[in-house]
Amino acid sequence: MSDVKTGSGGSPRRPYNSPKRVQAARERRRRMRTAAERLFMRDGYEPTTMLRIAAEAGVAERTLYLAYPSKAALLAEIIQVGVRGGEGDEPLARRAPWVEMLAATSIAEVVARFAGGGAALMSRAARALWLGEANAASDPQLQQARRRGHANIRADMTEFATGLHNRGALAPGLDVQEATAILFAICANETVFLRLTDECDWTPDQYAGLIDRLITKLVIAPHPSAA
């Protein structure tokens, strides 16, 4: 069925979406996510209701439900925006920092950029990721979002490992599948980041340095080519 409406004179009348209206809707959606994240982190996922989130965001509960049909949808988008580093439909692996990282001249620079990008991602998203993991068992929608998220992460790690393989940089005897598993285990664990930064007073830069060293030790050939 067409979305184009007809005016009184029979001429087609298209939905009106001014830049100001689109921007206002985007800002309202951002305000809802910010309010939800604040309450989730302060009070926990389970005790936080959609009504309280709406009140915190300064919108009607119906408005919140029109944007996000459930708490799980809200948390999933909070995580997605944090992981991607911004709004929009482009996945992480199609955004400029990732593309530029894979195109870096030397393997050492590729690994350093990957580690630094991972630290920045964890700084933005680790707490929301941890919250999703902690509550997935009791929320079927979160379970689904968790499975999708893990699949996306593994796909990104596979792309990274494949890029290293194509440049002759994987350690001897290491194939793309095993390299992907190692990267998935050591680079996509928000608990490790939070333990180091919260309990050991590490900075994100120190975490990036650790990831750099681990990848270099476990995944990269001793003298990789720069091809």
Question: Where do the language-model regions lie?
Answer:
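Amphipathic alpha-helical packing segments from all-alpha helical-bundle domains
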Residues: 116-133, 140-167, 177-178, 220
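Amphipathic, non-transmembrane alpha-helical scaffold segments
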Residues: 25, 29, 79, 111, ...
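Hydrophobic/aromatic-rich alpha-helical bundle segments in the mid-to-C-terminal region
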Residues: 3, 165-214, 222-227
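N-terminal intrinsically disordered/low-complexity leader segments
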Residues: 1-27, 223-227
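Ligand-binding pocket scaffold of soluble enzyme catalytic domains
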Residues: 4, 51-52, 63, 67, ...
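Helix-turn-helix
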Residues: 31, 35-77
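Hydrophobic alpha-helical connector segments
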Residues: 71-73, 77, 88-123, 180
